[in-house]
Swiss-Prot record:
Keyword Secreted part of the UniProt annotation: yes
Coiled-coil intervals: none
Modified residues (Valine amide): V28
Species the sequence originates in: Buthus occitanus tunetanus
Pfam families in the cross-refs: Toxin_6 (PF05453)
Tissue: Expressed by the venom gland.
Annotated localization: Secreted
Sequence similarity: Belongs to the short scorpion toxin superfamily. Potassium channel inhibitor family. Alpha-KTx 09 subfamily.
Source organism superkingdom: Eukaryota
Cystine bridges: C3-C19, C6-C24, C10-C26
Gene Ontology CC annotations of this record: extracellular region
UniProt KW keywords: Amidation, Calcium-activated potassium channel impairing toxin, Disulfide bond, Ion channel impairing toxin, Neurotoxin, Potassium channel impairing toxin, Secreted, Toxin, Voltage-gated potassium channel impairing toxin
Protein name: Potassium channel toxin alpha-KTx 9.5
Amino acid sequence: VGCEECPMHCKGKHAVPTCDDGVCNCNV
C-alpha cells in the first residue's frame, strides 16, 4: 500500500497512518 492509499487502508482500524520510505504503516 502506497502513501496516498495509506489513510484509506488504515481507516476503521483506530490507527494513525504513517509513511516511512514509501511504506504505509497503520500504527494502532
